[in-house]
Amino acid sequence: MTKFGVHSECGKLRTVMVCRPGLAHKRLTPDNCHDLLFDDVIWVERAQKDHAYMVEQMRARGIEVIEVHDALAKVLDDKAARNWILDRKVKADNVGIGMLSDLRSWLNEMPSSQLADHLVGGIAKFELPFDPKGLFGGYLDRSDFVLPPIPNSLFQRDPSCWIYEGVTLNPMYWPARRQETLILQSIYQFHPYFAGKVNIWWGGCDTDHGPATLEGGDVMPIGNGVVLIGMGERTSPQAVVQVAKRVLHREGGAKRVIACQMPKSRAAMHLDTVFSFLDIDLLSVFPDVVDEITCTSMYAGDREGEIRFERHEGVKLVDVVREALNLKEIRVIQTGGDAYQREREQWDDGNNVVALDRRVVVAYDRNTYTNRLMREHGVEVIEIPASELGRGRGGGHCMTCPIIRDEVKV
């Protein structure tokens, strides 16, 4: 039986989830891209080529890569699983009453691979093989979406995240992204690779979590039973404490959760946009933000469900991490260049690298200063083109959801 679990940020990566660019990105226009959380439209064919190159580099190192469209198509082959997804995706609240029956009948009979493409890529009114009835159907223009696309599925780090031997199914901050969690939940629940083998710590699409929001770019299981969770633009303290209660001192969970309070800005939307592990004792950081982070540690209390808090007033994140990992020293590589270049490279995901192993990372090619500094510190930097993939504001760390990763012995 496969043992899923992520035990560090930089140990050997063995299995990872990704989502290639596709139909959802062909739907992006200058008019709608900001609503869909992209800064610009992208050249989809080039983005697909660049994403495939990243996947090729991972597979060349023996990493098992699971692709969302393919996994979802496999799930949709099962009638019960298809019904489970469509019951939650195609509802009167989403598509109105008038077209509900006709739309559901059409999707029930659609080939699995085509349906997977549309569940991620959306459906426009002009694609319907029937004349949509009802007020909503008449309200829509020809190119309006019946089911909106979810192009941020490219960034698989966020809708679910593994914390040691369990996973959270994340209630995401922006409405444009909330359907991503449904896709991941269906894969973990019904795909034969995962079904019956996944320990879910918290979350799921059947509960309205209100302001308790969590995104995986803020979550880092760093080893020694410690997990960092950023609290900035996307992840709320209401969610962090609930997750802490579920993982602390549970079998396969964590012994310490460190909440990292960040400024709320799009440039630093997640912890992994300003802070990443290159090795257990080597970090890439954007100091302008990281030095302002305030940390609070959470531990299991004496009674069931009780949490003990320890606020680290005046102690920098890097020092909190060093102590939590029982390290004598942590070396820090700051985002490279002068003040202007440093800010540009952080914006272009210079710190958002994903480790394939200790001191082996995937990074965007455009961050030349930061990449050079990493190489000078003995890190192998595998560069991938940034011109198209980076338009959604996410790098290698954002585009990957580790499912099996080794621990690093301290």
UniProtKB/Swiss-Prot annotation:
| Entry-linked InterPro entries | Arg_deiminase
Which residues are the active-site ones? 398 (amidino-cysteine intermediate)
Q: Which domain of life is it from?
A: Bacteria
A single GO BP term for this record reads:
arginine catabolic process to ornithine
Per the annotation, which location comes first and is thus the protein's main one? cytoplasm
Q: Which GO terms describe its cellular component?
A: cytoplasm
Question: In the UniProt record, does the keyword Hydrolase occur?
Answer: yes
The pathway where this protein functions is: Amino-acid degradation; L-arginine degradation via ADI pathway; carbamoyl phosphate from L-arginine: step 1/2
**Known SUPFAM superfamilies for this protein?**
Pentein
Under catalytic activity, the entry for this protein gives: L-arginine + H2O = L-citrulline + NH4(+)
Under which EC number(s) is this enzyme classified?
3.5.3.6
Which NCBIfam families does the protein's record reference? PRK01388.1
Q: What is this protein called?
A: Arginine deiminase
The organism of origin for this protein: Chromobacterium violaceum (strain ATCC 12472 / DSM 30191 / JCM 1249 / CCUG 213 / NBRC 12614 / NCIMB 9131 / NCTC 9757 / MK)
